[in-house]
Amino acid sequence: MPQTFFVFCFLFFVFLQLFPGTGEIAVCETCRLGRGKCRRACIESEKIVGWCKLNFFCCRERI
């Protein structure tokens, strides 16, 4: 059973390497019509203005 899980994880990793951009979000991906950035946590000089995919926030500079 553990060997099957290891093989599945390895094949999934290989799949992600063959097709970049699938299943992951770039930190520099824009949101809110290009006015924000998708990040796991906003910087102190930014505020949360929405949600990106999964557990990412749409962060925008404070005015």
Swiss-Prot record:
Record's keyword terms, sorted: Antibiotic, Antimicrobial, Defensin, Disulfide bond, Secreted, Signal
Single biological process term from Gene Ontology: innate immune response
Signal peptide annotation: 1-23
Disulphide bridges, residue numbers: 31-58, 38-52, 42-59
Recorded GO CC terms: extracellular region
Tissue expression remark: Expressed in testis, epididymis (caput, corpus and cauda), kidney and neonatal and adult brain.
Entry-linked InterPro entries: Beta_defensin_dom
Cellular compartments annotated: Secreted
UniProt KW RNA-binding keyword: no
Primary role: Has antibacterial activity.
Similarity section: Belongs to the beta-defensin family.
Protein name per UniProt: Beta-defensin 35
Species whose genome carries this gene: Mus musculus (Mouse)
Gene: Defb35
